[in-house]
A protein has these predicted regions:
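Membrane-embedded segments
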Residues: 3, 7-92
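Short amphipathic alpha-helical interaction segments
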Residues: 5, 169, 202-203
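Acidic/histidine-rich, surface-exposed loop or edge segments in extracytoplasmic proteins
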Residues: 20-24, 154-161, 192
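A generic structural signal for alpha->beta connector loops
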Residues: 22, 185-187
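Structural motif
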Residues: 53, 187-189
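Short, well-ordered beta-to-alpha junction loops that form the rim of enzyme active sites
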Residues: 59, 192-194
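Secreted/periplasmic serine-hydrolase-like ester/acetyl group-modifying domain
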Residues: 71-184
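Substrate-gating cap/lid alpha-helix
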Residues: 195-204
Length: 204
C-alpha cells in the first residue's frame, strides 16, 4: 500500500508492480496530502485491508505549514463518509486556521456557485463513490524544470539555505502513523519520491 502526496501517486504503478514482481498493492496517494491525511487514509484502509508493508511518502512531513487549504482538502474529500472522515475533519480544522468545519461536514456548500451545473460525478465524488480503475495510480507525463526551454529535471536543485524548520503537526501525525503500524504489525517504509520541486533546503 502506498500513501502520501501526488508525487507517489504518479510514481508507483500497482499494475506494473504486479506484472513484474507479482506483488498486489494499491496507491492511496492524493495531491497535497498532508501527514494528517496520510494518517487517516491509513486508518481507513486498515478497516478492510491487512497489508504487510505500507510505503509512506514523506514530502509533506517537512513542510513548515500546509499549502493552499483548497488543495490540501482534496485528500479529505476523496474519503468515503464514516467515522474516520468525521475525525479527520474535526482534527484538521483544529490545526488549520483556513479550514471551515461547516464546509468539511457539509461539502455541498463549496458548490453553491454552480448548483444548476452539478452532475452525477459531483455527487459520486462527495459521497465517496468514485472508483479508480488504475488502483490509485495517476498517469502523468514528463515534468520539465523549465517549460519554456523544455529542460528536463535532472536531480535535486541547490539552495543556499541549510536547514528547513519542521511542522510540529506533521511530526505529530508521523508518529501516530508509526504507532498505528506497530499496533497492526505492519512494516513501514518511508520514501522521498524524486520531484522537480525538491531542493537541498527541504532535504536538510
Amino acid at each position: 500500500m502506498f500513501l502520501g502526496s501526488s508525487v507517489i501517486a504518479a510514481a508507483l504503478d500497482p499494475f506494473q508492480l504486479y506484472e513484474e514482481y507479482g506483488i498486489s498493492s494499491y496507491n492511496l496517494g492524493v495531491m497535497q496530502q498532508p501527514m494528517i491525511g496520510t494518517f487517516f487514509w491509513m486508518k481507513e484502509a486498515l478497516k478492510t485491508q491487512s497489508p504487510k508493508l505500507i510505503v509512506v511518502e514523506i514530502k509533506t512531513a517537512g513542510r513548515v505549514s500546509d499549502k493552499d487549504e483548497a488543495d490540501s482538502r482534496k485528500s479529505y474529500e476523496y474519503m468515503r463518509w464514516g467515522k474516520n472522515k468525521l475525525q479527520y475533519a474535526l482534527e484538521y480544522t483544529n490545526t488549520n486556521e483556513q479550514a471551515d468545519i461547516f464546509e468539511y461536514l457539509f461539502p455541498l456548500s463549496i458548490y453553491h456557485t454552480r448548483w444548476s451545473e452539478l452532475s452525477r460525478d459531483d455527487y459520486n465524488f462527495v459521497l465517496g463513490e468514485d472508483k479508480s480503475y488504475t488502483r490509485g495510480f495517476a498517469t502523468l507525463t514528463t515534468r520539465y524544470e523549465n517549460k519554456e526551454t523544455y529542460k528536463e529535471y535532472n536531480g535535486i536543485r541547490e539552495d543556499d539555505k541549510k536547514q528547513k524548520d519542521y511542522n510540529e503537526t506533521n511530526t505529530k501525525y508521523l508518529r501516530r502513523i508509526i504507532d498505528l503500524a506497530k499496533e497492526n504489525n505492519i512494516e513501514l517504509l518511508f520514501v522521498k519520491t524524486p520531484d522537480s520541486a525538491w531542493n537541498t533546503y527541504k532535504h536538510n
